[in-house]
Amino acid sequence: QATLDMIFELWADVAGVVSFHGLLRPTPHPNAPIRAAVLALHGYDDPMAPPEQLHAFQQEMTAAQADWQVVAFGGTMHAFTNPEANDPDFGTVYQPRADRRSWRMATGFLAEVLG
């Protein structure tokens, strides 16, 4: 969540932000426009950010007129980039394929926005 919070605290100073398995909670400034491009990389089966929270996040990004993208990885829980994550009961499981894909997407996104 810290990455997404940053777009409200430093929005004028960053070109883009990438969130890996963020919590997608409502922002502290719901009516503020977002000038940074946003890429949220999300595990669709993440119990810490269920589909309704994802939908609310997408609506909020649209209302803020953000240049946003969300990629939801199927069969993927929270902490999918952390090789130490192995607690399906808690909802954190490493997913190597989503880890590799998300890294490629993040580097491509950053290359675009930092151009």
Residue ranges and their predicted role:
Residues 18-21, 41, 71-74:
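Alpha/beta-hydrolase-fold catalytic nucleophile elbow
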Residues 34, 40-42, 46, 73:
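Short beta-strand/loop motif that positions the catalytic acidic residue
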Residues 45-49, 78:
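Acidic catalytic loop of the alpha/beta-hydrolase fold
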